[in-house]
């Protein structure tokens, strides 16, 4: 019985590169779908794939021209800077949530505190619109049963605006 050619000792990196080149575009597209911590993990995964692919091209293909190598270096550098900015933003928001209290450590960065718990908001990290009417409160178009507090980007929001339509901004 013959052995499998793709399982020999010298081709494990080729399998990794094949998966990397196949699944990195899928992971890049999934950044549109995911948000929060999962998007950060996918972003780090893409950065690692870009770096590994670039190192593979440099190390194993010495005949690669300088244009391809410089393009790979630019892509890895730009994605690395983007990943670093996203990690710093995530850490800043987590630190802000830690300053709000122990119960906020794992909370989403923008959420509404209600009597039922926390309700996540899909909004920008700086503004939210709250419409208060007798019997109901809408936050960015979402019905909130018992509005207690609004947190935007890890900061407690303060109200600015008219009586019924309130624009909340982070302190």
From Swiss-Prot:
Membrane topology, record value: Multi-pass membrane protein
A Pfam family hit: Arteri_Gl
Keywords from the named record: Membrane, Transmembrane, Transmembrane helix, Viral envelope protein, Virion
Main location: virion
Top-rank taxon, per record: Viruses
Entry's localization field: Virion membrane
InterPro entries from the UniProt entry: Arteri_GP5
GO cellular component, one term: membrane
The protein, known as: Protein X
Organism (species): Lactate dehydrogenase-elevating virus
